[in-house]
Amino acid sequence: MRFCFDRLCFATKRPAQNSNSNAPHSSTTVDAPPRPADVDVATVPVATPAPPPQQPVSNLFYADYQKLQPAIIDRDWERDRDTDTDTRSEAKPPDIVEHIEPVEEQRQIHTQIQSPAEIQIQIPPTPPAPSIQIQIQQRYRRHSSAEDRNLNTRRNDSNITEALRKAASMQQEPNANYQFPTDLGLVSIVNNNNNTNTHPSGSNSGSNNNSNINNNLVGGIVTLPAAGGLIGLEHTASGLRLIPAPPTHSDVLTHTLIYGTPPSGAQQLNQDPRSLLHQQELQLQQRYQQLQQLQAQTQGLYTSQGSPVLYHQPSPGSSQPVAIPGATCHSPTQLQPPNTLNLQQQMQSLRISGCTPSGTGGSATPSPVGLVDPNFIVSNYVAASPQEERFIQIIQAKELKIQEMQRALQFKDNEIAELKSHLDKFQSVFPFSRGSAAGCAGTGGASGSGAGGSGGSGPGTATGATRKSGQNFQRQRALGISAEPQSESSLLLEHVSFPKYDKDERSRELIKAAILDNDFMKNLDLTQIREIVDCMYPVKYPAKNLIIKEGDVGSIVYVMEDGRVEVSREGKYLSTLSGAKVLGELAILYNCQRTATITAITECNLWAIERQCFQTIMMRTGLIRQAEYSDFLKSVPIFKDLAEDTLIKISDVLEETHYQRGDYIVRQGARGDTFFIISKGKVRVTIKQQDTQEEKFIRMLGKGDFFGEKALQGDDLRTANIICESADGVSCLVIDRETFNQLISNLDEIKHRYDDEGAMERRKINEEFRDINLTDLRVIATLGVGGFGRVELVQTNGDSSRSFALKQMKKSQIVETRQQQHIMSEKEIMGEANCQFIVKLFKTFKDKKYLYMLMESCLGGELWTILRDKGNFDDSTTRFYTACVVEAFDYLHSRNIIYRDLKPENLLLNERGYVKLVDFGFAKKLQTGRKTWTFCGTPEYVAPEVILNRGHDISADYWSLGVLMFELLTGTPPFTGSDPMRTYNIILKGIDAIEFPRNITRNASNLIKKLCRDNPAERLGYQRGGISEIQKHKWFDGFYWWGLQNCTLEPPIKPAVKSVVDTTNFDDYPPDPEGPPPDDVTGWDKDF
């Protein structure tokens, strides 16, 4: 095939295919292009096509300066993927490198291209330059399936670097040749620095003789990575030709790259040859189209030696060329390399060599001028009319103007990046002034402490602000979420009932199938799903009616039985749903705004359930199961003397196992470490006689009976057979010895360092602040803004040596979001706490509009702000801050207080750099061994049992501790989705589904995974050794706990605090745009 243009020729040579698979691999070193003074023009006969339509000479054609990077490519194909034999071409003389016939699908690409007119090219010769040749062979195995063309590759940058280093060391060793195997395959290094090296033809490579240069290249194929794609250069007896290198999908690809000094192509070696060649194929096809257009536009244009006049081709019957009036030729100016030009510039920079038409002789052939580099191919004429010259000047002026505007735009971009760092304070004010955040009502500081995070000294949980753009940190300020508290008394829940609605079997199965198909609700127990199905009531929506409206606060979840609905967001269509689907499931967790609109396309029949009903079902089934399991355990002698909280822990880890009639639950003589309690059905106990093979019946066991208790005490040989007897099967509650030993411990083993040590200091604080009134406080500055109000830095009148954080919360907004109970709990817990890792509360005030909390000021700023600016912390820094949180948890958990809102936003630094826990709006004091069911926390940090409404306790804090470690080490939490529901689904998949970055060490990863176990009883810190098991973990080896507890350990980051009123570590905040809130005189806060 031949692809030719008016002045540029492309021709392919298709050699015969050879079946010799054992032919040796061959390669040829190509001399550098000639010097500009010695020009060789190879003339090829012109095959003139049909004359194109008349084209006006108004286009600008610039010279194409392309840096040549010669590369020889030899392609072999591995025909059989099941053998290691390569099908290669037959060995050729050293001066010839031929292509193997492309496979059919490769050949089709070429046959689709039309053959235009033949053209002529011009190459300035130059003697060879010293070079280092590095050959790297990469092997790919072809799959036999036509549909699967994915090629597996192995890349090893270190081996490439080693090859380049070896090449550099060979600069002074002529004719050196080294080969060695690597993970990439065979690597060859050849030194061609010998200027007297004789080519295969026998000519001296250092000669400037053009014929020698040509002879050396006869039959050779050299690839030139040009702007439009991979171009092949072939020298034949009729002249030099450019050919398109055939697209390759070969299984064996050998790159031989020739480098001068320095070897600048090292980076190119690291490119994946598959993607590079594919890109070059596409560019080459685009190049064909551009050259066809150019050929049509320049058909018949030529000029004579040294003449500034541009001529048409001679008219038929005439031997004289016709001059083009107003068209002149100019020497070109050097352009940028083509690969940096845009498409329009590439079109303008297509190669046009000044030449004569066939038959006019060589006297009129111009010589190139203005060559800057011998490795450049240039033509030295550009056609332009006087009018076009003016356009050129205008375009150049506009390009200069564009460059100036681009510089100004870059400056503005830098300014924008600077201003984005100040957006936190604005985005923290406006969303919460409207009473909602992130689409959730009653969120983002629903605790009331979101207005200062800490108890006052920082922006806290509810700011909703966007983080400053850091290198690796894109997470926005986390928002706290809280549902309205529910009654958690099992006695009250027993008297709560919801109506049940009749359904046919088809509807019941459809609802069940829809729930099990939902990523979130499929995690519910089957007993809970059955009750939910029973309580769902029917609703019907006519066509074109709204089922769910974006922005509304929802409390109902739907299951669609039949019909079709359209889902849209912000007026844009998202999808169409039909069949059994769950709609609006986030509403059953807490009050939240709908994130999309769902409209009935046809009449729709749905089943619905209210959030209150759903949460009651979840709580009641959990409490009933817990009470039932605890009663079972109390009937077992080895459990009857255990504390109530220990029994509840054991009941949480009991797994229900089912057996069919005739199954051997336990076999005599077998080893075992499990203990069983029968919850349903009957089993038969037998013993095998030693003198006979018959089994002797001993007795029957039923519901409430147990067996295998000796396995928990260390005896692992079974002494009897236990066989399922009931026709309906048997259900057993099972616990293994390891889990039992982790949970059972003497209470004396757990040390509580804080029992009464702070009681006296607490009384002293109360006495000191007893006479301070709200009017005695003077506001200095605002430290933070949150969901319920603001946090102000204040001083008492007449005392400038101390400062405090005054947190003020709007009473009306607390009532609106039903967070009264959380606020009272926060005041009670902080008022009793006396721990150096927890912010101290000194006194509380109230009036008709606000509640006030006077607290310790921590002027070092939020840990979240430092993390945002740094991107992430190293291992040592993360260990220090994690240890501070562990100390705070040790104090709280020893008093049965669950925190529930751990995150960097709720950790403040004092003046020394020690971290203090703040914002106790979600904290709660639990009864011994009891759980709580209120959904609250930050979406990225909530534990699975909180999401599934199974009840949670202090074990949820250990989950969030693992999440905090991950975020401090990486800059982002491990569980992050585009919306809360997606985040919850990621959490339910577990920590084992998360890919850990390399910067997290093995010990840190191990601790995170032990803290973030799906089963709360398996989490480190919740087991037998308590929180001391965390302190003893390998990640904390060598950590100076005593120095931390006594504040003698040097913190990794010491904030700059110049005075007691220095607020430079906090943002500036504007005044409240909404003004004072309305009065609240309901009296709910009489004990505040």
Curated annotation (Swiss-Prot):
InterPro entries: AGC-kinase_C (IPR000961), cGMP_dep_kinase (IPR002374), cNMP-bd_CS (IPR018488), cNMP-bd_dom (IPR000595), cNMP-bd_dom_sf (IPR018490), Kinase-like_dom_sf (IPR011009), Prot_kinase_dom (IPR000719), Protein_kinase_ATP_BS (IPR017441). The modification Phosphothreonine is found at T934, T938. Residues 15-28 have a biased composition (Polar residues). Residues 15-39, 128-158, 191-211, 305-336, 441-477, 1064-1088 are annotated as: Disordered. Residues 144-157 have a biased composition (Basic and acidic residues). Residues 777-1036 form the Protein kinase domain. It is an enzyme of class 2 (transferase). One of its GO terms (cellular component) is plasma membrane. The active site is at D901. GO terms for biological process: feeding behavior; habituation; larval feeding behavior; larval locomotory behavior; long-term memory; motor neuron axon guidance; positive regulation of Toll signaling pathway; protein phosphorylation. Residues 70-528 are annotated as: Regulatory. Residues 1037-1088 form the AGC-kinase C-terminal domain. Coiled coil: none annotated. It catalyses: L-seryl-[protein] + ATP = O-phospho-L-seryl-[protein] + ADP + H(+); L-threonyl-[protein] + ATP = O-phospho-L-threonyl-[protein] + ADP + H(+). Its EC number is 2.7.11.12. Residues 1-69 are annotated as: Dimerization. ATP binds at L783, G784, V785, G786, G787, F788, G789, R790, V791, K807. CDD domains: CAP_ED, DD_cGKI-alpha, STKc_cGK. Keywords: ATP-binding, cGMP, cGMP-binding, Kinase, Nucleotide-binding, Phosphoprotein, Serine/threonine-protein kinase, Transferase. GO terms for molecular function: ATP binding; cGMP binding; cGMP-dependent protein kinase activity; protein serine kinase activity. Residues 441-461 have a biased composition (Gly residues). Belongs to the protein kinase superfamily. AGC Ser/Thr protein kinase family. cGMP subfamily. This is cGMP-dependent protein kinase, isozyme 2 forms cD4/T1/T3A/T3B. The gene is for.
